[in-house]
Amino acid sequence: MKFVIKLFPEIMIKSESVRKRFVKILTGNIRNILTKHDETIAVVRHWDYIEVRSKKEENRPHLIELLGRIPGIHHFLEVDEKPFTTIHDIFEQTLQDIGTSLENKTFCVRVRRKGKHTFNSLDVERYVGGGLNQHIPSAKVQLSKPDVTVRIDIENDNMMLIKARHVGIGGYPIGTQEDVLSLISGGFDSGVSSYMLIRRGSRVHYCFFNLGGAAHEIGVKQMAYHIWQRYSASHKVRFVAINFEGVVGEILEKVDNGQMGVVLKRMMVRAASRIAERFGIQAIVTGEALGQVSSQTLTNLRLIDEASESLVLRPLITHDKEQIIAMAKEIGTDDIAKSMPEFCGVISKNPTVKAIKAKIEQEERHFDFAVLESAVQNAQYLDIRQIAEQTEKEVVAVDTVAVLSAQDVILDIRSPEETDEKPLNMENVQLMPFYKLSSQFANLDQSKNYLLYCERGVMSKLQALYLKEQGFSNVKVFRQ
């Protein structure tokens, strides 16, 4: 099984030295991700493409899924590579491989060729196309907008029949740009802005300001872990959690109501700048969009930036909310965001849309900065992979079972896409995506025991912890 990886076009127009560096990094990223799932993987880089081979045909669907989420890949081709001797041999092998798929369809043949041959690309197109037309009575040649385009690449004595073309996410390979620190709240905006910087080639670390207790932190960890695992698992990243409840309390007590939103954001970027400086991170990322809420006017954003010692990036600055939600759906964070409370928005009842610097500074003089200093000093730092390990320690009170009793119901909490792709074929299974547990679990028959199931056990244990904290004792984790 072979895939041919085509590079993001902007990589190809770089200088030779930069392009080589980008391709080398992308090759390493592909290898890091795929070898975790298939030990037979071989990844080889060429001048303008990357070749991926596997000996395990059964891994094909999973490898396609993984390659489709690696930044730097524009598209990739599934190919069947074989040696050939003559132009007639090319036709016979093509007929054998795809003949049945052309029945009752229109088609054309497109060929690209490298090397020395007694024929050119057009000769092959005519010969193979004519042969297929003669041997498949129900098929018909149509050069303009055919049902099927038969694509063949020829290089020296080998032919590659392109069986399928898959679209990648594009962008630059992670590691080609410098690291950034994303301020993640678990909402639509911060998840999408994090993804946009990942796609642009930055390793994205996460900084979370906890305003809502353990349940809020669990939800944000789920989102950060989801984004990392899905789009940037080739790299280690940090998850930083800062308890901001004391800072919020200080603001509520000492800052004028209309200035609270801007002051809170200034405190956040101050703290994030300290974290970024500690790890040599060049910029912080926020999900702010111009005019979306009162604190996101140009005047207010400028005042917020002045509190930061780091560059502040806002990739969503011109995006509409509708566009942001659509992007969240594409990357799979929308359902998590829907279940996440928005704590920042309720801190100020009459927020200013055009804060005055002197007024803000006057209000901040009432603030005890020792509270902010304490919050930063007591920040918790995690390798994002430790979220799974931390879950093992935190959910010690949740039993893990493999055998069902009469009162047990398996609650499959995977996303609808996962359950459709890999259904759990067992008895007594109910589907309830993890993001609906908080609102719908109480509606279930509470005389039953519910065994939460997800593929890796991370999400099920995080949700078990949450439900236990909400007072539900009939929760366990199911592992096959």
From Swiss-Prot:
The family line of this record is:
Belongs to the ThiI family.
Residue ranges annotated for the THUMP domain, each copy included: 61-165
CDD domains, sorted: PPase_ThiI, RHOD, THUMP_ThiI
List the transmembrane segments.
Answer: none
Q: Where does the record place the Rhodanese domain?
A: 404-479
Q: Which reaction does it catalyse?
A: [ThiI sulfur-carrier protein]-S-sulfanyl-L-cysteine + a uridine in tRNA + 2 reduced [2Fe-2S]-[ferredoxin] + ATP + H(+) = [ThiI sulfur-carrier protein]-L-cysteine + a 4-thiouridine in tRNA + 2 oxidized [2Fe-2S]-[ferredoxin] + AMP + diphosphate; [ThiS sulfur-carrier protein]-C-terminal Gly-Gly-AMP + S-sulfanyl-L-cysteinyl-[cysteine desulfurase] + AH2 = [ThiS sulfur-carrier protein]-C-terminal-Gly-aminoethanethioate + L-cysteinyl-[cysteine desulfurase] + A + AMP + 2 H(+)
Cystine residue pairs: C344-C454
Q: Where is this chain's protein located in or outside the cell? A: Cytoplasm
Say which species the protein is native to: Pasteurella multocida (strain Pm70)
Q: Which biological pathway?
A: Cofactor biosynthesis; thiamine diphosphate biosynthesis
Q: Which domain of life is it from?
A: Bacteria
User: Mind telling me which HAMAP family this protein's record contains?
Assistant: ThiI
GO biological process: any one? thiazole biosynthetic process
What is the name of the protein in this document? tRNA sulfurtransferase
The catalytic site is made up of C454 (cysteine persulfide intermediate)
Q: Which GO terms describe its cellular component?
A: cytosol
Residues at which ATP binds:
L183, I184, K265, G287, Q296
Q: Any idea of its EC number?
A: 2.8.1.4
For this UniProt record, the keywords arranged alphabetically read as follows:
ATP-binding, Cytoplasm, Disulfide bond, Nucleotide-binding, Redox-active center, RNA-binding, Thiamine biosynthesis, Transferase, tRNA-binding
- Tell me, what is one Gene Ontology molecular-function annotation carried by this entry? CCA tRNA nucleotidyltransferase activity
InterPro entries according to UniProt:
Rhodanese-like_dom, Rhodanese-like_dom_sf, Rossmann-like_a/b/a_fold, ThiI_AANH, ThiI_fer, ThiI_N, THII_Thiazole_biosynth_dom, THUMP_dom
What is the purpose of this protein?
A: Catalyzes the ATP-dependent transfer of a sulfur to tRNA to produce 4-thiouridine in position 8 of tRNAs, which functions as a near-UV photosensor. Also catalyzes the transfer of sulfur to the sulfur carrier protein ThiS, forming ThiS-thiocarboxylate. This is a step in the synthesis of thiazole, in the thiamine biosynthesis pathway. The sulfur is donated as persulfide by IscS.
**Source gene?**
thiI
